[in-house]
From Swiss-Prot:
This is Small ribosomal subunit protein uS15. One of the primary rRNA binding proteins, it binds directly to 16S rRNA where it helps nucleate assembly of the platform of the 30S subunit by binding and bridging several RNA helices of the 16S rRNA. Forms an intersubunit bridge (bridge B4) with the 23S rRNA of the 50S subunit in the ribosome. The gene is rpsO. It comes from Acetivibrio thermocellus (strain ATCC 27405 / DSM 1237 / JCM 9322 / NBRC 103400 / NCIMB 10682 / NRRL B-4536 / VPI 7372) (Clostridium thermocellum). The keyword rRNA-binding applies. GO terms for cellular component: cytosolic small ribosomal subunit.
Amino acid sequence: MQKELKQEIINKFKLHETDTGSPEVQIALLTERINHLTEHLKVHKKDYHSRRGLLKMVGHRRGLLNYLMKTDIARYRAIVEKLNLRK
């Protein structure tokens, strides 16, 4: 992921001025990486190493979403709506 794109995502989802690690930012960054890797795997179907990385990222994002759902349901619903995620 390019530096400018990463900074743009952080700016869009940050909760306060110096926020870089909130669950919302982490979920948004993971979603971008997952989408990019999904496109890669459509072309390179036998890239099993990258597929494993994709599954790990999806699991990590799911864990962050579960944490957010347990702690603050309003923030969870907002991030799911913004990123057009299922559930």
